[in-house]
């Protein structure tokens, strides 16, 4: 686990030696628990040390987890590599957080404020841990089913954070 300890975030992005990093986590003070996430880095990220990249947050469906977009699931690496190599998209960082069955929203009773954690803890953490272009114009959120609902909800409620939202069969 390459995660900084609670309260130990640095301003220097960490070094990574592989593109797909499935076992990342951090402690959320808002939710009072560990939050797992997977990361897919572009090939260029490993071969040079100064470039910055846009970020796409990929949200899973009901019953899924941070591995749902990984090699044994929807395989975002295969899709991203094909689209990058044919020039359809540029190299990007993909972040796949564990969303539980939260719809990526705050609970009505305030007992599980997932969206608050996402905006106030996860996004800033990613901008510190990785070489991101920390700007809403370089940040997107997408998801399928429950994650599609979450992607549309998060971006519509936080246009200061995301410039693109994609809901794939949002439920």
Predicted regions mapped to residue ranges:
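Non-catalytic cap/lid and distal C-terminal segments of serine-dependent acyl enzymes
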Residues: 1-171
């Amino acid at each position: 686990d390459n995660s900084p300890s609670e309260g130990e975030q640095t301003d220097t992005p960490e070094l990574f030696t592989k593109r797909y990093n499935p076992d990342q986590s951090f402690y959320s003070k808002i939710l009072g628990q560990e939050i797992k996430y997977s990361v897919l880095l572009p090939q260029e990220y490993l071969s040079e040390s100064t470039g910055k990249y846009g970020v796409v947050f990929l949200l899973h469906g009901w019953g899924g987890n941070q591995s749902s977009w990984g090699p044994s699931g929807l395989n975002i690496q295969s899709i991203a590599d094909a689209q990058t190599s044919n020039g359809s998209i540029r190299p990007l960082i993909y972040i796949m957080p564990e969303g539980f069955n939260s719809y990526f929203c705050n609970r009505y009773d305030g007992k599980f404020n997932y969206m608050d954690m996402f905006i106030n803890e996860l996004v800033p953490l990613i901008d510190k841990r990785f070489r991101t272009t920390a700007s809403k114009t370089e940040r997107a959120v997408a998801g399928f089913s429950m994650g599609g609902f979450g992607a549309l909800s998060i971006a519509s409620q936080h246009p200061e954070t995301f410039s693109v939202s994609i809901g794939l069969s949002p439920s």
